[in-house]
């Protein structure tokens, strides 16, 4: 058997005569989850969201999803007026939508089916009007008397019974004839000797009226009266792994997994718990643990590690100056290694790149071609020169060295052989 899911949406009103209700319903929905407000809270920038939705956004970005202004969870306040408005609209929505759809269907049916018969009926009524008025004018006395008797409503007098008012349940007690105080039969005569005639109190505690409260009911009453306390935000960089695991264990949530997963789990539990504190009917801890387990199966354990690393750089409390100071030595080491590799590439590629013009120059200067190295001025020029895109360092070093060594090679070639 197939199941059909009817998801309420603000577009349900567009095909009905009450199409103007659509923007009203849209204003009662959260801009994050697109559902009706659940425990609505208002931000410092006067925007309203679900408590859980805005807490998740602030814990991730620290900005309002509507206007992108900075905000904090401590500034959130509950919006009871919107909560009552949403509840009233949700209760009235099914009947309103049903009436609107019936009106739309009747309008379509009335325009094409019952339009002609209605016009005929009006004509017939107009033709039969005089006859009907004439027949109504001739009436006998019996008909008029019968009509008057039918028109007058029948009034039935209610019989009041004094015994019903004075009925008192039998509890084995007798009332004092002077003050009306109820007591046992054998205590009436002793009471008459000392009775002052004062009326009995309205609410008198009898012997069986005081019922002891069970421990379970007393405990449940204390729980309902005392609101749950909110969880404070913590700085995870100040906590070690074992301390963070102990904190999760004290809260009653799982403490397994790597450190990034522990942080995400604690943040989600903090959002669930604090959002539950904003509700008029808070959920139990078991229900919150079930929601955390659903989040664990869908998002928590399956988040990519790269996303966590990007979030740590993009989070609102990221300190760039402290980051550069902590990793400054590593940056210097990487720069020094890059310069060493650059010099090594220049030394290994330049001797092979110098071509021999002819056999005489190669034979006359063997040591000059095999032991050639980068001159100091070439190295300095390479360090200050900007390398164009697509050009290797070896090519630039070859060109610079060829320019400097060209006069020496020309002298060797032009010198006469011995």
Swiss-Prot record:
GO-annotated molecular function: single-stranded DNA binding; ubiquitin protein ligase activity; zinc ion binding
BP GO terms, sorted: postreplication repair; protein monoubiquitination
Domain SAP: 236-270
Subcellular location: Nucleus
Biological or metabolic pathway of the protein: Protein modification; protein ubiquitination
Keyword set, alphabetical order: DNA damage, DNA repair, DNA-binding, Metal-binding, Nucleus, Transferase, Ubl conjugation pathway, Zinc, Zinc-finger
Zn finger limits (UBZ4-type): 173-200
Zinc finger (RING-type): 30-68
Catalytic reactions of this protein: S-ubiquitinyl-[E2 ubiquitin-conjugating enzyme]-L-cysteine + [acceptor protein]-L-lysine = [E2 ubiquitin-conjugating enzyme]-L-cysteine + N(6)-ubiquitinyl-[acceptor protein]-L-lysine
Sequence segments annotated as region (Disordered): 110-153, 206-231, 350-389, 399-418
Basic and acidic residues: compositionally biased ranges: 219-229
Tagged with keyword Ribosomal protein: no
InterPro entries attached to this UniProt entry: Rad18 (IPR039577), Rad18_fungi (IPR004580), Rad18_UBZ4 (IPR006642), SAP_dom (IPR003034), Znf_RING (IPR001841), Znf_RING/FYVE/PHD (IPR013083), Znf_RING_CS (IPR017907)
Chief localization: nucleus
Pfam families assigned: SAP (PF02037), zf-C3HC4_2 (PF13923)
Residues annotated as binding Zn(2+): 176, 179, 191, 195
Gene Ontology terms: cellular component: nucleus; Rad6-Rad18 complex
Composition-biased stretches (Polar residues): 359-373
EC numbers: 2.3.2.27
Oligomeric and partner information: Interacts with E2 UBC2, forming a complex with ubiquitin ligase activity.
UniProt record similarity statement: Belongs to the RAD18 family.
Biological function: E3 RING-finger protein, member of the UBC2/RAD6 epistasis group. Associates to the E2 ubiquitin conjugating enzyme UBC2/RAD6 to form the UBC2-RAD18 ubiquitin ligase complex involved in postreplicative repair (PRR) of damaged DNA.
Name listed for the protein in its UniProt record: Postreplication repair E3 ubiquitin-protein ligase rad18
Organism: Aspergillus fumigatus (strain ATCC MYA-4609 / CBS 101355 / FGSC A1100 / Af293)
Lineage, broadest ranks: Eukaryota, Fungi, Dikarya, Ascomycota, Pezizomycotina
């Amino acid at each position: 058997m197939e199941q059909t899911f009817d998801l309420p949406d603000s577009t349900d009103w567009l095909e009905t005569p009450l199409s103007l209700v659509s923007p009203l319903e849209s204003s009662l929905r959260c801009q994050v989850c697109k559902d009706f407000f659940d425990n609505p809270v208002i931000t410092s920038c006067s925007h309203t969201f679900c408590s859980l939705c805005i807490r998740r956004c602030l814990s991730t970005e620290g900005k309002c999803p509507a206007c992108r202004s900075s905000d904090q969870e401590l500034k959130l306040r509950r919006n009871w007026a919107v909560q009552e408005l949403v509840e009233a609209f949700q209760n009235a929505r099914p009947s309103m939508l049903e009436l609107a759809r019936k009106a739309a269907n009747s309008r379509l049916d009335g325009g094409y089916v019952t339009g002609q018969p209605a016009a005929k009926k009006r004509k017939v009524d107009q033709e039969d009007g005089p006859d009907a008025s004439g027949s109504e004018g001739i009436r006998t006395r019996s008909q008029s008397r019968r009509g008057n008797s039918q028109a007058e409503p029948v009034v039935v007098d209610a019989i009041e019974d004094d015994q019903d008012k004075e009925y008192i349940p039998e509890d084995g007690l007798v009332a004092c004839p002077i003050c009306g105080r109820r007591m046992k039969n054998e205590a009436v005569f002793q009471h008459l000797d000392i009775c002052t005639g004062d009326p009995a109190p309205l609410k008198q505690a009898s012997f069986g009226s005081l019922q002891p409260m069970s421990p379970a009911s007393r405990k449940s009453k204390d729980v309902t009266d005392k609101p749950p306390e909110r969880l404070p935000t913590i700085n995870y960089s100040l906590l070690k792994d074992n301390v963070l695991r102990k904190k999760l264990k004290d809260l009653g949530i799982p403490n397994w997994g790597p450190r990034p997963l522990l942080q995400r789990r604690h943040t989600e539990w903090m959002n669930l718990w604090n959002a539950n504190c904003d509700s008029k009917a808070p959920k139990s801890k078991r229900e919150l643990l079930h929601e955390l387990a659903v989040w664990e199966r869908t998002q928590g354990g399956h988040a990519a590690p790269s996303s966590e690393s990007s979030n740590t750089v993009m989070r609102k409390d990221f300190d760039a100056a402290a980051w550069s100071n902590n990793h400054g030595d590593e940056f210097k080491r990487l720069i020094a290694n890059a310069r060493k590799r650059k010099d090594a590439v220049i030394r290994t590629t330049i001797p092979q790149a110098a071509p021999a013009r002819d056999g005489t120059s190669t034979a006359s200067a063997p040591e000059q071609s095999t032991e050639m190295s980068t001159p100091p001025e070439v190295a300095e020029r390479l360090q200050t020169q900007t390398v164009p895109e697509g050009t290797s360092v070896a090519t630039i070093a070859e060109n610079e060295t060829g320019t400097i060594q060209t006069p020496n090679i020309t002298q060797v070639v032009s010198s006469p052989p011995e």
